[in-house]
Amino acid sequence: MTELTTIAFDIETTGFETDDKLTVVGFDSAVSSRVFLNTGGSTPTTGLADRVNDTLQTPVQLTLHDSEPELLTELATFVTSTLTQRDAKLVAYNGERWNGGFDLPFLRTRFCTHGLEWPFGTLPYVDVMDVFEKRFNTSEDSLSGVYGELIGSGLNDLDPFADSGEAVTVWEAGAYEPLITHNVADIRRTRALMELAERYCSKSDFSMKSLEPVI
């Protein structure tokens, strides 16, 4: 487990339905974060990336995309040219589990909708939520709740949203800075929890799966 670098990821969307869209996709490693923003064709205020980086200690590389297909195309290029070339594992919190999850099913639907190939095939995947449900005695099950109980306030204080539903409202209003900050808080909380779990749990406690399609 630990010989594979953790790449945490999380997405933001306009909702949960089949025709809802991606607004943000973020990845985080120990070195930096990589964030893709769908602007829906709008023009963000000047200096957005600089303001985001002024708020956050570890660098964030931000790219802007006018549409969801453009975001997905650039995302696929990043995954295949960068992530799959590393000894890395993809990690999410409730991204995809045996009984559900959100991020990966949503991504599959959007790639399929636009007729794009699935880019994550060679990356192993771990859902860290499973470990904390089974191997830690916590009273919370949300990402922020488990992080707060086991690690402390830290990145929870960074998150500008009290409810993830705010991510939809601010995107529609073109208020991208808090949306990006929320996503970065999520991916960094996810990576922090994965590192915590690796310090206290055995390899057999983690369920690692392949994301490679059959065909």
Short names for language-model regions:
Residues 38-43, 206-213:
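Short alpha-helical "patches" and their helix-cap loops
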Residues 2-108:
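Conserved non-catalytic scaffold segment of RNase H-like nuclease domains
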Residues 30, 87-207, 211:
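Metal-dependent phosphoesterase core characteristic of DEDDh/y 3'-5' exonuclease domains
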Residues 1-5, 208-215:
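Terminal disorder- and signal-encoded targeting elements
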